[in-house]
Amino acid sequence: MKNIGRKSNMTDKQIKFFKELEIIQEQAVSMNISQSNLTKEELLFNVSYDTVVLMMELLDGYRNMVLELSDKESREILNKDIQLHDGVVDFLKSF
């Protein structure tokens, strides 16, 4: 675990993945920064909601990578035959 955060010890794909997460974080904040009419709690729900949706889009292949999300124990691929970014809207709160 001591390699975490050291780009020199990461593969190109790992760096690309973390760069996508960096972009997602920036986008989620930018999408919500001007919502001054919301309470702090509502704003936090929105930022976290948008972050998760954007991450699900990454897993769904709508960004610069094609990834699989799998359960290690059963090896079930969780993003097979489903759009995670569509499914998440039924579970998370947004204002």
Q: What is the predicted role of each segment?
A:
Residues M1-L38, L69-E73, S94:
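N-terminal low-complexity, intrinsically disordered segments
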